[in-house]
């Protein structure tokens, strides 16, 4: 009898469905600063990767646009000269159903970028290689930490906005 109750409880929860309907590069910029300035010799790159996330509801029911923005700057460790700058805005169009409303925001900004990440990694690797550098293979990005940091930042700003 306990098994029937457990089966009934799980049957009532909606099944989460997520489909990637499309994905594309919205904006891409690569500047080989090293070649433009004529920097030569041995360089030891120091790479800084900044990630920004955004999600928007589309006009079609259950469709969302998830945007991952990467800003990558590589500098020479020795002199601090900029070697290259890569800016990428990558978009995924998702059809999502069965996610409770209170869990939708983290789902969009954690799970969706996680699904897109292998494609982002390949693009960054190809662009850096095609730009005259060794392929830059990004480490895994902790989208949960990025989400939590953004929530903490917004909560810290909220009292300041109320008092102003």
Swiss-Prot record:
GO CC aspect terms: cytoplasm
Name the predominant localization. cytoplasm
Q: Which InterPro entries match?
A: SecB (IPR003708), SecB-like_sf (IPR035958)
Does the keyword section mention Transport?
yes
* Short name of one Pfam family: SecB
Q: Where in the cell is it found?
A: Cytoplasm
Q: Which GO terms describe its molecular function?
A: unfolded protein binding
The record's HAMAP family line, in alphabetical order, gives: SecB
Q: Which family does it belong to?
A: Belongs to the SecB family.
Q: How does it assemble?
A: Homotetramer, a dimer of dimers. One homotetramer interacts with 1 SecA dimer.
Recorded protein name is: Protein-export protein SecB
According to its UniProt entry, this protein's organism is: Ruegeria sp. (strain TM1040)
